[in-house]
Every structure is written in C-alpha cells, then in structure tokens.
Amino acid sequence: MKIVVMEPLGVKMEQINALAAPLQAAGHDFVYYTAKATDQTKLLARVQQADIIMLANQPLSAEIINACPNLKMLSVAFTGVDHIALAACRERGILVCNAAGYSTNAVAELTFGLAISVIRNIVPCDARCRQAGTKDGLVGFELFGKTFGVVGTGAIGSRVAKLAAAFGCRVLAYSRTPKAELQADGVRYVSLDELLAASDFVSLHVPLTDATRGLINAEAIAKMKPTAVLLNTARGPVVDSEALAQALNEGRLAGAGIDVFEGEPPIAPEHPLCHAKNTVLTPHVAFASAEALAARADIVFANIEQWLAGTPQNVIK
C-alpha cells in the first residue's frame, strides 16, 4: 500500500525513519513531506494515489478525499478531527483514527501557563523590565482559593481539574459524562449556567461539534463574573471572539488566555482578540511539547500497524 504523510509531524527524521522502517520492510511505499502543501492542487498531487494518509491539522476536504480512489484509512496526528470531512469518509467507508491522549499533559500545563500569565501580568511585566520600568500597577492575584470551572472532563479536562485542585482551587465541572474519579477527589459537577456564574476561571476542554460551536457566546459571557478569566485551549469556534473581545474591552470580564481561534494561525492583525484588554494569546501551541509530538508520532504509526493487522485502534466513530 502507499502511505503518504502529507505534512510534517514536528519530530526529528530519525524518529520518522525508525517508525517507517517496519512498514517499508513489509513492502509498503512510504512518502513523508517535510512542508505543508501550499494549495489544494499541490495537496491533491501528494495524496491522490494514497491508500493511507497521515496528517496533523491541515484541513482535508471532501473534494480531496473523493478524488483519492484508493484511500482506505486516515491516521490523524491530532485529538480533534473537525478539520476533516468525516461525512465523506463515512460515505466511502474510510477508517479514521486519531492520536487520542498524546497531548493531555501538554495542553493542561499550558492552560495554567495562560492562567498565570493573565492573573500575574506576565506579558506586561516582561515589557516593563525591558523598558527599565518598575512594578507599579502590576499587582496580580492568586489561583489559590479561587473557584476553577472546567467545561468538558475528557482526558485533558480531567487533568486540568486535578491540577486546579493541586493549586488549591475549588473545582466545578460541566460535562455530559461526569467522572466518578473526579467526584471522589472533590470535583463538583454542576450545570453550565451555575459553573459560569460561580467560577473565577472558566477553562474550555470540549471538542468542536454542532452543540459546542458558539457555546461561549455573548449570553454565556454575561453570566460570568466581571472578575473572571476565560481560558480556551480547546477549539476556537467554541467561543464567540467578537463577544469576548467586547466584554474584555468593556470591563465585563477580567481577562482571557486563548490558544485557539476560528482558523489556524497566523491570525489577522485585525482579529478582535488582538485588540482586547488583559488577554494573552498563543498561536495554537498547547499541544506542542517535544514529549507530546514524539508521543503522537508513535501513536499514528501504531494506528496504521494495528489497522493493517486487523485490530484497529483509536477509531473515530
């Protein structure tokens, strides 16, 4: 079979070569691209004859999928798969597997990096030092003793809840599927409205679905404390950026730490959050630790090997 890795996976070629070696030894044709395709025509030229495509976060449209007559499997080096035309895959009987769990620690840790950056004024402090300034006006506040709301308690949300408790926070959670383990640790599951109203921090950890798109809109933001901080390391469209920026600029929300946007960075300079007060922005890097990238490469190659062996894993239903 022809296996095409249509974009780089962010790890050293030594790891790629080691992971590809068993597939090549079994007679499979393996192609690895070290840069993203710059347009859809070039992308199609890469993948059109593939039996298996491996990708990270570059969108894969129905048009591209349907133009690949031999395509049987996608191994996605990401947790979310909202950038892939899943309906087209289902219609064609193409198996889709993801890299479940690879970035749990990385995303959870950056969530708190963003939180602390916002509440302790890390970015303004850095600028002040470089400008030979003082600490005047840069008094922050602590995580300890605050109420930390976690929206979505999958693997990442659960890890965030445990870290919040370790910081001395009272932890609230909202999820369709409460976790007994978290409840045993003192996490209290509540309605989304109660979480929004009671939390000093609201941290988002839900996939992008029809139900979660625009979940945090103007109405939801209005239910939050004016002293609260919103954290989004999930998916950009879960939040209405215009409504969030307006609330921040009008003082109806204290701050925000945002890693994800409506599309992949670079984001336009005129994006509303680029001009919002008390906001720390990062260019979708929550997943991007060396450890996480190495782990996801292992997972997506294992997905292929397991499928070839007739025992697929990490299957997206």
Task: Map each language-model feature to its residues.
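Phosphate-binding beta-alpha-beta segment of Rossmann-like dinucleotide-binding domains, i.e.
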Residues: 92-94, 100-147, 159-162, 166, ...
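Rossmann-like dinucleotide-binding domain for NAD(H)/NADP(H)
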Residues: 96-97, 227-317
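Rossmann-like adenosine-cofactor binding region
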Residues: 62-65, 177-272
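N-terminal glycine-/charge-rich "phosphate-binding" loop or analogous flexible N-terminal tail
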Residues: 1-50, 172
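Glycine-rich, N-terminal phosphate-binding loop of Rossmann-like dinucleotide-binding domains
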Residues: 7, 55-57, 78, 204-206, ...
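Glycine-rich Rossmann-fold phosphate-binding loop(s) that bind the pyrophosphate
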Residues: 153-154
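Structural signal for repeat-unit boundaries in curved repeat scaffolds
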Residues: 47, 68-71, 196
